[in-house]
Curated annotation (Swiss-Prot):
A single GO cellular-component term on record: cytosol
Keyword Zinc: yes
Annotated gene: thrS
One MF annotation (Gene Ontology) recorded for this entry: threonine-tRNA ligase activity
Protein name per its UniProtKB record: Threonine--tRNA ligase
A GO BP entry: threonyl-tRNA aminoacylation
Source organism of this protein record: Proteus mirabilis (strain HI4320)
Similarity-based family: Belongs to the class-II aminoacyl-tRNA synthetase family.
Role played: Catalyzes the attachment of threonine to tRNA(Thr) in a two-step reaction: L-threonine is first activated by ATP to form Thr-AMP and then transferred to the acceptor end of tRNA(Thr). Also edits incorrectly charged L-seryl-tRNA(Thr).
Amino acid sequence: MPIITLPDGSQRQFENAVSVMDVAADIGPGLAKACIAGRVNGELVDACELIEQDSQLAIITAKDDEGLEIIRHSCAHLLGHAIKQLWPQTKMAIGPVIENGFYYDVDLDHSLTQEDLETLEKRMLELAKTDYDVIKKRVTWAQARETFVARGEDYKVAILDENISQDAHPALYHHQEYIDMCRGPHVPNMRFCHHFKLQKIAGAYWRGNSDNKMLQRIYGTAWADKKQLKAYLERLEEAAKRDHRKIGKQLDLYHMQEEAPGMAFWHNDGWTIFRELETFVRCKLKEYDYQEVKGPFMMDRVLWEKTGHWENYKENMFTTSSENREYCIKPMNCPGHVQIFKQGLRSYRDLPLRMAEFGSCHRNEPSGALHGLMRVRGFTQDDAHIFCTEEQILSEVNNCIKLIYDVYSTFGFEKIVVKLSTRPEKRIGEDALWDIAETDLAKALTDNNIEFEYQPGEGAFYGPKIEFTLYDCLDRAWQCGTVQLDFSLPGRLGASYVAENNERKVPVMLHRAVLGSLERFIGILTEEYAGFFPTWLAPQQVVVMNITDGQADYVQKLVKELQDAGIRAKADLRNEKIGFKIREHTLRRVPYMLVCGDKEVESGKVAVRTRRGKDLGSIDVNDFKEKLLQEIRSRSLHQLEE
């Protein structure tokens, strides 16, 4: 007679073992219809799962995050069902859930086309709209293997042979004549899987190993209802318009080429943005009392062996040899900063020591993972390392948090999700030190009125960390900022200071990043602003145009005056119609276009127009200059009269 306790604390008693769906039906027919799965004593299970003992139960519906994930997983099975009907010789590999959707890797004897994708999606919808029940059956390992051998599903057989114990009882999910194997849970009926869209096809090696066969990966998205799907597809459409690669080309910011994969060739306007960003961060470093240093970008492999990077990270490191010595091009700045700390005798009076660098780093990312500025091999990292005592951890973390929020607010990012990762099972350092560190990190967040969630066991082996994830205007997540405590590296590399009692002690080190990679952050900003960079960051801030040759001298004089004031201004004296010039510079997202005709020359004014098409009328040159300088100096996100 199991007693079921629901999330609101109410209880229901049943005579015999009862399924999740039975409990939902007992509560009400509406909930039974909406029931996708259940969470029994914290574990996600299928709606058909029997509960035999007293248990805590939460009914999962499409309104829950878990419910949506299950819908997506079941859509992957639906894809398998449809593709086997269309091309029966297809061999199914794996079909997991990913962010916003799912994919399935398939082995097919022909290359899928866009037309095939449309045919496949149509068949999926036809099948889903029959609202068939999904039947789950537990079988022995041998029965599962026999099933997939008979069906010619070589990849499923390989999964059983290599990944599943022969003592296990795998779950087989029956979609009419189609059978798939999965840990589940899955939807009980395909009425939950009507709102999906197949998106693209890519190549993927079986097991992610380039020595294995290349499979075709079919990506799709799935949502709980039509409205959610429509909104997501609209966001994708908007994201495509904002793609930094497309805008980067339109605005002539940078380019990539095959001879230097994952490394940007910065053009003048793109490099202007880069340098402005660097200058801004540099001002903040001075404000928050950091030293700026510069370490070599290449160091002997021996040093990387001492740090542990060679053992754990060598696949991602570029190397070169000279005079019988092997060198590693640095993937990160921290070992170099420890070397600087070690020069000379350090005292507790020198701490905290905040050391920042715009470090040129390189990581050997897989070529298939490279993506514009967002995923590169060569990048500039804005990280810093703070050497401090255990007693200074709290104040230093506080200082880091203030800096991070100070910077993010300048760019208009308001939604920031914060996570605190705590000690993993395998770690170094005494528990007492971990206690201090975790308590101080949490207190610093609380002191700054920052909501956060714990990620138990997700910290690095050498210390806990805080992660700051930005959400952009399309609600996409970008993990940029980190504050990571490190109890290991300074000791590994022999760093120490003289404590107040004249004993040698190893400093605590904080790794701190705000923007992360400057290249990636420029990519994020390009998409956030759709290329309409705030005036202070815009590569060209003002363009001054004449209507006829008679205003050329006035235009050149005005441009020089603006340039002398530190404003990035240029003249456009081409013999083109003024409407043509305005349109061209509007497409280039120049914040201000100044038009000079005879009337403006006579009055000492300029006709001001913004890139958004707003006509600000005739403004006195000095008034405009002062207002513009104020906008630039304050790093305002808004243009004049916005």
